């Protein structure tokens, strides 16, 4: 992975931490730590957290619970522990991001992008400020370039957010921005259990099926996709990846390398 990233030209640093399977609440807390640091200190580099989650359903801040269909369970919040232990099925959490309900689980790469948009002129609009629609299109481009590496043509659908392959949605995006620092991000279906999506109306879109890369490219693996995602992210945003430990990503200790 390091060698693959090193093919990139030098640019501002993107500190990348690739974790294994991380519970949603824990990953959410990691984002809050990094977000607070980036708001407090504009010199903190951009960061990308790449991981998978155990099964969980999340709703955006304004999501309609009707898209949970018949899914039963208390809707919780990532900043509070459930009143009683979850014994059956995935948790259901309402979070700050935009968008409707989605599913996260094994076989899906989730990327949490913490970027200071003030540093990214390519997402600026004509009004001289960062444009969140442009940022969303940049995230889509990351995913389109990623699937293209595996011989697949990723597509946008006007009026919707995400990436489709042959009419199947393979990537979902949901973001939140605080003082021009982004958090939350994207989810790319590599080889998840798609049956988990049948319990909901994914992203509130009833007439668009969900798909996965392995359906179109049977030999694809999670391990093969991860470095391509990172490289595509860096190419689209003009950054250079720097692999860091979790403690470095959280700012608990300084990285030995702070500039690419």
Swiss-Prot record:
UniProt-annotated location(s): Cytoplasm
One biological process term in Gene Ontology: protein modification process
Residue runs in coiled coils: none
Keyword entries, A-Z: Acyltransferase, Cytoplasm, Transferase
Main location (coarse class): cytoplasm
Annotated substrate binding sites: 97-104, 172-174, 185-187
Residues the record marks as site: Lowers pKa of active site Cys: 169
A Gene Ontology term for the protein's cellular component: cytoplasm
Reactions listed under catalytic activity: octanoyl-[ACP] + L-lysyl-[protein] = N(6)-octanoyl-L-lysyl-[protein] + holo-[ACP] + H(+)
Domain BPL/LPL catalytic: 42-241
Disulfide pattern: none
UniProt keyword Acyltransferase present: yes
Listed InterPro entries: aa-tRNA-synth_II/BPL/LPL (IPR045864), BPL_LPL_catalytic (IPR004143), Octanoyltransferase (IPR000544), Octanoyltransferase_CS (IPR020605)
Pfam families, sorted: LplA-B_cat
Catalytic residue positions: 203 (acyl-thioester intermediate)
EC number from the UniProt entry: 2.3.1.181
Example of a GO MF term: lipoyl(octanoyl) transferase activity
Function of the protein: Catalyzes the transfer of endogenously produced octanoic acid from octanoyl-acyl-carrier-protein onto the lipoyl domains of lipoate-dependent enzymes. Lipoyl-ACP can also act as a substrate although octanoyl-ACP is likely to be the physiological substrate.
Family indicated by similarity: Belongs to the LipB family.
The protein's name in its UniProt record: Octanoyltransferase
Natural source organism: Synechococcus sp. (strain JA-3-3Ab)
UniProt gene name: lipB
